[in-house]
Amino acid sequence: MDTNHPGSAGGRGGLGSIFGGGPPGYSHSDLAGVPLTGMSPLSPYLNVDPMYLVQDTDEFILPTGANKTRGRFELAFFTIGGCCISGAAFGALNGLKLGFKETQNMPWSKPKNVQILNMVTRQGALWANTLGSLALLYSAFGVIVEKTRGAEDDLNTIAAGTMTGMLYKSTGGLRGVARGGLAGLALASTFALYNNWEHIKGSSSQVSL
């Protein structure tokens, strides 16, 4: 049954003539004869089969060829900034402790406040510089090792930590280089073990079964 009455069509035509034209009116019978070529029989709104749109795993919106995880270069900024902030906070607390310890016999006055503030500032800057320098060296070595090997795994972490310790203690001679390398190796190995602890536990439980 055609629901487009002549009166309504005339009304639309009259308004269209007043405002300079309007869209032509089509009845349902006219639209029913338009062929929908290329449409999938499973969905009248898509020209592809919806089964191809089903994803079994989570997908990320990334540029073509981009990795799904952050690389060493992207994490370097967070690592350096986090170490600087952590060092400044730890140094400030340590400086506050040392300031109160050194001025415990002084009366509470302006010189005492200035001395405590100087100690807080000095210790905060010292620790922020130390941890920031270590983070910078670690991140630089991590990026170099990643680009050289073409892979990102725990071996890069261990190698970067070892080289960071060796370079940081290089001013102490061969003995200092050895100590720094061993310290960096121990810390990096502990960090890698912590990151893979759940995987190691799962693998050991599967082997026991």
Curated annotation (Swiss-Prot):
Keywords: Membrane, Mitochondrion, Mitochondrion inner membrane, Protein transport, Translocation, Transmembrane, Transmembrane helix, Transport. Pfam families: Tim17. Its main location: mitochondrion. One of its GO terms (cellular component) is TIM23 mitochondrial import inner membrane translocase complex. It is found in: Mitochondrion inner membrane. InterPro entries: Tim23, Tim23-like. GO terms for biological process: protein import into mitochondrial matrix. The chain crosses the membrane at residues 73-93, 125-145, 180-200. It comes from the Eukaryota. It is a multi-pass membrane protein. One of its GO terms (molecular function) is protein transmembrane transporter activity. Component of the TIM23 complex at least composed of timm23, timm17 and timm50. The complex interacts with the timm44 component of the PAM complex. Essential component of the TIM23 complex, a complex that mediates the translocation of transit peptide-containing proteins across the mitochondrial inner membrane. Belongs to the Tim17/Tim22/Tim23 family. This is Mitochondrial import inner membrane translocase subunit Tim23. It comes from Xenopus laevis. The gene is timm23.
